[in-house]
């Protein structure tokens, strides 16, 4: 765990405490992370589930969750109001009965708790699929007015003797083959996310080509997306298209892309598609010694994040802090 980065996030949360919903309140990993959070006063866990079952699950694995708020959809006093609001949000696509049935599930119920202001953010996916976490967010939280898509970013951290290396990579998890305009949005959102984690973003639009050395539709896509991103955010350091070696090696960057404000010093990487992105971040994780935090969902009106179903309690704890830091 990148202790320095997380301590900075915790210090920020201490100044403005948040409430986070966990959609799977009986999961042992969620309970362990919640017990750790309850030791502080800066991030209050809300566990969804039957109160007796949640407490029994915590007792079985030996975690003290005294003080945690537990909310059971089946006995929630404001359920009628929640159903009414969800019907309005779905705009005729779901009946009241269908909404009520959906709200008996932690993913929909938790998302509506965020929508109604009971919680500031949500973390799910310990047992739910990514689709089952993202779908309610798209339907109920929706994207920000300036955003057309939900995208994602991984924060990659490698601890060093003197300092940490912190990078941002997107989109490695959500958009399979983004268009030029979607890549513009992905780049700008990743840059915003990078700033939250102390990165001064230098954004590289990656390709197998550097400054026209290669030809093809994907090269054109990255070059055009980069040009549009630069026009949309002239104050950001953005450049491309470029190969990864030109992006990270000052020597290669100077040779292949002289005069670039990014080449050789990039720290925020935009991949042409999910294949490249997913492979890229996992190479950095498995061979480069980086810890990967994410996927962090970008573009929504409130922070909703997805865990890997193979996550451990430490990863739940870390992602809870990251999610709350974005609230």
Locate predicted features.
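Anion-binding alpha/beta catalytic cores of soluble intermediary-metabolism enzymes, centered on
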Residues: 1-263, 267-327
């Amino acid at each position: 765990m990148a202790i320095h980065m997380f301590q900075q996030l915790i210090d920020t949360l201490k100044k403005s405490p948040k409430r986070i919903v966990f959609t799977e309140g009986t999961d042992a990993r969620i309970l362990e992370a919640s017990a750790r959070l309850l030791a502080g006063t800066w991030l209050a866990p809300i566990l969804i589930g039957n109160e007796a079952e949640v407490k029994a699950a915590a007792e079985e694995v030996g975690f003290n969750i005294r003080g945690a708020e537990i909310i059971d959809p089946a006995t929630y006093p404001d359920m009628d109001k929640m159903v009414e609001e969800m019907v309005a949000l779905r705009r005729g696509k779901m009946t009241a009965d269908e909404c009520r049935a959906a709200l008996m599930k932690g993913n929909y119920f938790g998302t509506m708790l965020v929508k109604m202001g009971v919680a500031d953010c949500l973390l799910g996916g310990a047992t739910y699929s990514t689709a089952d976490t993202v779908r309610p967010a798209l339907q109920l939280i929706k994207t920000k007015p300036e955003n057309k898509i939900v995208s994602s970013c991984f924060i990659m951290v490698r601890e060093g003797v003197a300092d940490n290396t912190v990078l941002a990579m997107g989109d490695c998890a959500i958009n399979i083959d983004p268009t030029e305009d979607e890549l513009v949005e992905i780049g700008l959102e990743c840059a915003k996310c990078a700033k939250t984690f102390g990165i001064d973003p230098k954004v590289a639009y990656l390709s197998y080509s550097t400054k026209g050395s290669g030809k093809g539709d994907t090269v054109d896509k990255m070059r055009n997306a980069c040009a549009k991103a630069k026009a949309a955010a002239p104050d950001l350091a953005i450049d491309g298209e470029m190969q990864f070696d030109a992006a990270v090696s000052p020597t290669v960057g100077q040779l292949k892309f002289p005069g670039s404000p990014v080449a050789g010093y990039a720290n925020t990487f935009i991949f042409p598609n999910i294949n490249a992105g997913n492979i890229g971040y996992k190479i950095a994780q498995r061979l480069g010694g980086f810890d990967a935090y994410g996927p962090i969902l970008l573009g929504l009106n409130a922070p909703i994040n997805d865990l890997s179903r193979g996550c451990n309690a430490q990863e739940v704890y870390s992602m809870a802090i990251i999610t709350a830091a974005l609230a």
